[in-house]
């Protein structure tokens, strides 16, 4: 089984790296404000029709555009969900959502989290799924990519005060990156057997003679952008373990590839725009090392079996509880690490049923800030924060002013970096503490002891870091949990974007200094090790006490 696991990991890494390289070149053109071939005329007509000016923006204007679009989208989606019973494409006559669930869901999809306190097939109409959630899957992904576009320009431009035009970037990302790739993936899913229709739910008779109601809907179109945009919210409650969403082993492999495609391509694009492709490869090496180690740990833990079942005399040589038999332990373990490393949150297995160590790794990947590939855009700008921190630490050790790509990293940048890095740990630890101190928080726990605490910690970690997956043993559809997690999702998303954009505004005005004999190389194995160490150190110092009360205590008990 070890050989099978190694082959699976190696094949996955090879395929997504090969696919991401050409996409990275296309993204580099967009970052450099060079239209893709054959798109100039279409863009000119669209910009004119929409009244979009291509005048460049400073960081405050760029940030205002991103925030304005997302807040408007939140309001529209909130009222759409409240009044879905008045809207078309609702063959099951599903009622509108309660205010707290509508708020939680709207914030969830606008922030690219896709936390779901509901079952899609029994709660949302086709219109809400298609015009509400799927639209936000595109816009939230485009927003994250636009932010990293601005940050990359800040590192590569000299003595300027503008970072591009947010509206131009959003349109280009949506039209020329997300839409065509998502369309190809959706067509492939349909060919493989995923649903794509507007039929009412179908009553069928099973082979045992019982009646069953099969849900229908425009699934494939939402599934494609759900994975490509690292959104993760399922059309059905079972998410990607549902055969109508993920019908074959081939679609499952493509879903994993789609999750990592854009985050990897952005690393290639960064190196190309920076004029030193080694910089992008350095980031990919750091991410890949952490990723492979985490996959190996989860596979090992799940192959060992469930010790509690073994103690009861059951045959549990491997831990198949909560896993699809058509995917198995190894693929389920790989998918769990992919979806939590990349802030996607889609699942093909119940993470709540993983072993203590097997469930701790996905939780920890979220807690370090979703920087191991991470979400589209958000993963790379999150990792760039750790790059700046690593450069600062190295500068302290060698007694030089820290710099990255020739730009001095001053006190202002480091204060903003520290602020951005501390946002999500603060939300996770304070949110979990609040939940454990209140009756409303504890009443949602379906399990006692360390595992019950792990469910709470996982939920808040998932929300604050915009992942969206869950340990499902938590009854989170209550006003307390819907509001708490909505707050964590909103602040966890925009509380990081704001300082990142401020860092971009500060760096873009600086002039790059030529490298000297005392300049720390940021493209070699030494810096890769320093970056990995920085990520691990911050994660360990912040979350080891909380993890010790949850999965570690469960493992030792």
Swiss-Prot record:
InterPro entries named in the record: KdpA
HAMAP family: KdpA (MF_00275)
Record's subunit section: The system is composed of three essential subunits: KdpA, KdpB and KdpC.
Protein name: Potassium-transporting ATPase potassium-binding subunit
Assigned protein family: Belongs to the KdpA family.
Residues that span the membrane, as ranges: 5-25, 63-83, 132-152, 170-190, 253-273, 283-303, 329-349, 356-376, 379-399, 416-436, 484-504, 526-546
Encoding gene per record: kdpA
Subcellular localization: Cell inner membrane
